[in-house]
Amino acid sequence: MRILQISDTHNKHQQLTNMPAADVIVHCGDFTEQGTEEETLDFLNWFIELPYKHKVFVTGNHDLCLWDADGIEDLPDNVHFLQDRSCEIEGLKFFGLAYNHPEERIP
């Protein structure tokens, strides 16, 4: 399995072109600059449309809009928002620990 990891795109995700082939893309946070809903929706629309089989993301310290979100409604089955939770993709477990996690939520 090939995994592509990106982070800290700060609203510049549209500038990412010709990214390497992979089975899974993981965005490790800071996809927004100010953490607004508009920035977050722009990122999600871009991320969902990427041509990777599986997509995983967590929040960073800039992604304020999703800090208190337990989940996001209506994501496609191949897009995983890991806010202090895990998922398994083709036998490999992914765990997302958000930037602002309370210590008692660490397994």
What are these regions (language model features)?
Residues 1-4, 86-96:
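Beta-strand-turn-beta hairpins that frame and shape the catalytic cleft
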Residues 92-107:
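Binuclear metal-dependent hydrolase catalytic cores centered on His/Asp/Glu-rich metal-binding motifs
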